[in-house]
From Swiss-Prot:
Entries under Gene3D superfamilies matching the protein: Light-harvesting complex
Family label: Belongs to the antenna complex alpha subunit family.
Keyword rRNA-binding: no
Keywords assigned by UniProt, alphabetized: Antenna complex, Bacteriochlorophyll, Cell inner membrane, Cell membrane, Chlorophyll, Chromophore, Light-harvesting polypeptide, Magnesium, Membrane, Metal-binding, Transmembrane, Transmembrane helix
Keyword Cell membrane: yes
Name of the protein in question: Light-harvesting protein B-800/820 alpha chain
The species this protein was found in: Rhodoblastus acidophilus
Length: 53
């Protein structure tokens, strides 16, 4: 492991949940930004434009 000595400074019982939690929060924030700041993504998730019959 390249950065293996980090666990001598930070306890893994604290560091791993912080790392995984920060990754999850970042992913949720990116998805929220895509949903709220684009027009194509909500249309894509709703199936696009409906064609007249």
């Amino acid at each position: 492991m390249n950065q293996g000595k980090i666990w001598t400074v930070v306890n893994p019982a604290v560091g791993l949940p912080l790392l995984l939690g920060s990754v999850a929060i970042t992913a949720l924030l990116v998805h929220l930004a895509v949903l709220t700041h684009t027009t194509w993504f909500p249309a894509f998730t709703q199936g696009g434009l409906k064609k007249a019959a």
